[in-house]
């Protein structure tokens, strides 16, 4: 992953001790690249799945906790996808292919 200074093309300096930290931040803000200031969010948003997992409804009642899954009646068997139709007397049926169509 690229560093912040390589992305924006400006140097990022760190203050050596806490007494000089306020002065270093002030000078750094003035010399930011084109007036840009990079700040981190103090309260980043959750991604959608994490948000839904955190805010999902909980089972708080005893009747909800002990609830079993619903039992449904079994489904009837499905009809076949294909039905092969064979004439009663397949040996006497005369099959002639259709004549070819002339192409233009």
From Swiss-Prot:
Any single biological process term in GO: translation
Spell out the Basic residues composition-biased ranges. Answer: 44-60
Recall the GO molecular function terms of this protein's record.
Answer: rRNA binding; structural constituent of ribosome
* InterPro entries (UniProt xref): Ribosomal_cL38
Q: Where in the cell is it found?
A: Plastid, Chloroplast
Keyword Metal-binding among UniProt keywords = no
| GO terms for cellular component | chloroplast; ribonucleoprotein complex; ribosome
Q: Give the record's keywords alphabetically.
A: Chloroplast, Plastid, Ribonucleoprotein, Ribosomal protein, Transit peptide
Quick one: where is this thing mainly located?
A: plastid
Q: Which family does it belong to?
A: Belongs to the chloroplast-specific ribosomal protein cL38 family.
Q: How does it assemble?
A: Part of the 50S ribosomal subunit.
**Official protein name in the record:** Large ribosomal subunit protein cL38
Originating organism: Pisum sativum
């Amino acid at each position: 992953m690229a560093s912040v200074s390589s992305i924006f093309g400006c140097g990022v300096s760190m203050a050596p001790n806490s007494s000089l930290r306020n002065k270093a931040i002030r000078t750094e803000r003035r010399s930011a690249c084109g007036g840009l200031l990079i700040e981190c969010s103090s309260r980043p948003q959750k991604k959608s799945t994490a948000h839904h997992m955190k805010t999902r409804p909980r089972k708080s009642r005893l009747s909800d906790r002990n609830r079993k899954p619903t039992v449904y009646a079994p489904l009837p068997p499905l009809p076949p996808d294909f039905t092969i139709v064979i004439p009663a007397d397949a040996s006497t049926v005369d099959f002639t292919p259709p004549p070819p169509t002339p192409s233009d």
